């Protein structure tokens, strides 16, 4: 019997299995698909996700090599067409060397299929993971202290079987059938817009030689959508709006899609191959509950975040990092069942903030449309022609472009989110969302433990790499007392186990006798002004929801 059943083997489901395995927890990972994803879909793998990957032995540096270099995918461009006039540009996220002050691994543009392939290789090699493609979970119900599942062979529906597990994670996507079967409702708008994702192959390097970028927003009247450059030499997507109520998907033939691509590029192309055409609906919803009994929602099944901001996939990875160590602690007898209640308490607010920001990003793009087209439909062409000729004569255009910055730089949301729950002792208040690009490292309880470049045995490395992803870490001040008899807690002494160029008191705001207790997910669980057995054990009892 698997300890945990994971339904859905996308990046979130695979990451859940790998994280659980790191804690010694075996899982069964199933997916109804018989083949892996080929369409590019998501591409922004942010700093926090890369840090999590690195913590489980998936080299973040090697992952970043799969993505577009910053000089290829480091800009967002607002254009008429791909080859038409350009009205402004912005850096795409924090890919500059300055980001290394806050994270060892800046965001990288990695097509989702490539990211999934790397995860899949690690999953396939992990003896703790039973990985089954072509397996549909048709029923998942709470049954006392277990979860009962019915699994069906996707290739032969006459073959089905039942199994029991201690817990289950539903990572089965935005249209989660498990969420629906649990009667968990979603909050927020269900259908903001409808798009066709037209995935095509073409070598457009010659056309973008002087305007490399990852996103090209198209504003020429009659040209709608966004071009996404996953690889300028071969892999592109045109996001094209459509109306499913008045249009039929079958009307979008390859020939019609090729014509739309020509229009978006601004000239007729040769050597274009339309690979895939798939519809999708932009929503902005968060589940009212992340848990029902012993079944948990994670990733898109828990939140449908608009793609404007690249926060969806990364939020899902954050979900399972938060959940996995808690499940492992309970299953290994180290924590009480109540610890699992903190999953929703901590992750749901993060999803709501990310959802709201992504929705605001999408809405702000309309301000740019108005700046370019005006508010009189009959004069759209006239205004656009004037702006195309003399964009500097329209200062409101530059302001509208500048206002898009939060869309493409949400560094604080990506690595600066905080938690406030019973699994944090005396958490600092969570501040209101301000400038989402302005990340300020915090040493407060509940905050993500800050990255520092430190030296150990002559080697420069991130302090993150010394924090255990498998157990609690006690980072002690230079004059603090060592705690004996706690083999399950990793202890680090500031200035001895590693060297930092800055002062402990200046960094942490704690006396040299103090310490920080850091959870396996890298969040600060509590702060100690002095380290003593009584306070330490009291904190452990609260953090792990133990009644002893």
Segments from the language model and where they lie:
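Flavin (primarily FAD) binding-site architecture
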Residues: 170-184
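C-terminal helical "tail/cap" subdomain of flavin- and related membrane-associated enzymes
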Residues: 328-448, 468, 472, 479
């Amino acid at each position: 019997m698997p300890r945990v059943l994971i339904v859905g083997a996308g990046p979130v489901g695979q990451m859940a299995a790998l994280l659980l395995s790191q804690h010694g927890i075996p899982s069964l990972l199933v997916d109804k698909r018989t083949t892996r994803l080929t369409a590019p879909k998501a591409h922004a793998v942010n700093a926090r996700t890369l840090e999590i990957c690195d913590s489980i032995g998936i080299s973040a540096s090697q992952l970043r090599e799969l993505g577009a270099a910053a000089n290829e995918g480091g800009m967002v461009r607002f254009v008429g067409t791909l080859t038409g006039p350009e009205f402004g540009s912005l850096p795409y996220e924090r890919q500059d060397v300055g980001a290394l002050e806050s994270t060892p691994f800046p965001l990288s543009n990695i097509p989702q299929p490539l990211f999934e392939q790397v995860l899949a290789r690690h999953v396939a090699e992990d003896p703790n993971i039973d990985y089954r493609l072509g397996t549909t979970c048709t029923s998942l119900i709470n049954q006392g202290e277990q979860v009962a599942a019915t699994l069906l062979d996707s290739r032969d529906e006459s073959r089905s079987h039942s199994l029991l597990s201690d817990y289950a994670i539903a990572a089965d996507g935005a249209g989660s059938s498990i969420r629906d079967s649990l009667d968990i409702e979603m909050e927020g708008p269900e259908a903001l817009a409808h798009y066709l994702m037209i995935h095509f192959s073409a070598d457009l390097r010659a056309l973008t030689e002087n305007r490399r970028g990852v996103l090209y927003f198209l504003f020429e009247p009659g040209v709608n959508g966004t071009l996404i450059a996953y690889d300028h030499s071969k892999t592109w997507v045109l996001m094209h709006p459509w109306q499913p109520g008045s249009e039929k998907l079958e009307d979008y033939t390859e020939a019609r899609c090729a014509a739309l691509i020509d229009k978006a590029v601004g000239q007729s192309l040769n050597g274009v191959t339309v690979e895939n055409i798939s519809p999708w609906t932009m929503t902005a919803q968060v589940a009212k509950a992340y848990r029902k009994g012993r079944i948990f929602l994670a990733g898109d099944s828990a939140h449908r975040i608009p793609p404007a901001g690249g926060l969806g996939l990364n939020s899902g990875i954050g979900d399972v990092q938060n959940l996995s160590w808690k499940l492992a602690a309970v299953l290994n007898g180290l924590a009480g069942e109540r610890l699992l209640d903190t999953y929703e308490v901590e992750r749901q607010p993060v999803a709501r903030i990310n959802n709201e920001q992504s929705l605001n990003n999408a809405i702000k793009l309309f301000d740019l449309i108005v700046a370019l087209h005006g508010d009189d439909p009959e004069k759209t062409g006239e205004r656009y022609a004037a702006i195309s000729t003399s964009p500097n004569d329209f200062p409101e255009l530059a302001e509208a472009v500048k206002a898009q910055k939060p869309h493409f730089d949400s560094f604080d949301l990506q690595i600066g989110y905080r938690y406030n729950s019973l699994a944090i002792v005396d958490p600092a208040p969570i501040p209101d969302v301000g400038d989402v690009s302005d990340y300020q490292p915090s040493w407060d309880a509940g905050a993500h433990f800050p990255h520092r470049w430190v030296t150990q045995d002559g080697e420069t490395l991130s302090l993150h790499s010394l924090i255990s992803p498998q157990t609690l870490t006690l980072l002690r001040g230079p004059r603090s007392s060592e705690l004996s008899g706690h083999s399950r807690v990793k202890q680090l002494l500031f200035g001895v186990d590693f060297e930092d160029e800055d002062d402990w008191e200046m960094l942490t705001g704690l006396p040299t006798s103090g310490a920080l207790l850091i959870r396996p997910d890298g969040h600060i669980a509590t702060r100690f002004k002095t380290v003593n057995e009584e306070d330490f054990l009291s904190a452990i009892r609260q953090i792990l929801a133990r009644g002893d």
